[in-house]
Curated annotation (Swiss-Prot):
Protein name per UniProt: Cytochrome c biogenesis protein CcsA
Primary localization: plastid
Locations listed in the record: Plastid, Chloroplast thylakoid membrane
HAMAP family named in the record: CytC_CcsA
Organism: Oenothera argillicola (Appalachian evening primrose)
């Protein structure tokens, strides 16, 4: 009873922190000047991380097993993993764009957990026989950590694509505007003044330089985080194969979850291969990562909606 009450309190605290965090995050998107609000949002993510840690420990204590037996618990662990990834750049006081991705991911996932959509799974239950194994913690934790890192890395790639394509659209619109303004007497007079030419050129070159630097950093950090996630995913799949052989007598059964996990692994293996090819630009790799981002959510949520296969114990119904 004490554990249940404690979990209930921690759930409400995390929900409150997430609600405040979402509000602050939306305000900072429109008002960049308020730095204090952004710092509050960052600290809110850390508070959420502590609450989620308390939730996981509490569920572990009164259920007697590591809390990764259904979708609700795995989402809790996913938001905890996002918060862990968020902690590293936060403690180093750098890479604010990485923290923006991880904090928004934590807020979104924890908001989904506390929204009531998965209320049927919030009550801890006795593990089904297939899950009563020491491999549960190893396999599922590695898979979820892999998903978290791959999702964060993919979102950085999506940000890279947005910046790149916005730049391409601006260049295209500027070319059209230049052709239109070339016949304007006022525009010609403005361009002929040396001071205006220097100011305009220096502003554009400085802006392009910082944009290029940002694209480079997004590309580098995306590659690093995806590489880490790929290692976790590989360990998770291999440990799952060993567990499957012990439980069902076969390393691989090609049920929906296993099939989509393999597709996810293949997609990010292709991504890492493109990183080794000097002929591939960062945009091409980012497109592969974006496709991988979609595939992860199909593997994580889409397969659970089917409710079939050897992994159907983690499924849920939307009714």
């Amino acid at each position: 009873m004490i554990f249940y009450t404690l979990e209930h309190i921690l759930t409400h605290i995390s929900f409150s922190l997430v609600s405040i965090g979402i509000t602050i995050f939306l305000i900072t998107l429109s008002v960049d000047e308020i730095i204090g609000l952004y710092d509050s949002s960052e600290k809110g993510v850390i508070g959420t991380f502590l609450c989620i840690t308390g939730l996981l420990v509490t569920r572990w204590a009164y259920s007697g097993h590591f809390p990764l037996s259904n979708l609700y618990e795995s989402l809790l662990f996913l938001s905890w993993s996002f918060a862990i990834i968020h902690m590293f750049p936060y403690l180093k006081k750098q890479k604010s764009y990485v923290r923006t991705i991880t904090s928004s991911s934590t807020i979104f996932t924890q908001g989904l957990v506390t929204s009531g959509l998965l209320s049927e799974m919030q009550q801890s239950e006795i593990l089904v026989p297939a899950l009563q194994s020491q491999w549960l913690m190893m396999h599922v934790s590695m898979m979820v950590l892999g998903y978290a890192a791959l999702l964060c890395g993919s979102l950085l790639s999506v940000a890279l694509l947005v910046i790149t394509f916005r730049k391409a659209l601006k260049i295209f619109s500027k070319k059209k505007a230049f052709l239109k303004d070339s016949f304007s007497f006022v525009e010609i007079q403005y361009r002929n003044e040396p001071s205006n030419v220097l100011l305009s050129t220096s502003f554009i070159s400085s802006k392009n330089y910082y944009r290029a630097q940002l694209i480079q950093q997004l590309d580098r950090w995306s590659s690093r985080i995806i590489s880490l996630g790929f290692i976790f995913l590989t360990i998770g799949i291999l440990s799952g194969a060993v567990w499957a052989n012990e439980a069902w007598g076969s390393y691989w059964n090609w049920d929906p979850k296993e099939t989509w996990a393999f597709i996810t692994w293949t997609m990010f293996a292709i991504y890492l291969h493109t990183r080794t090819n000097p002929n591939f630009q960062s945009v091409n790799s980012a497109i592969v990562a974006f496709l991988g981002f979609i595939i992860i959510w199909i593997c994580y949520f889409g397969v659970n909606l089917l409710g079939i296969g050897l992994h159907s114990y983690g499924s849920f119904n939307l009714h």
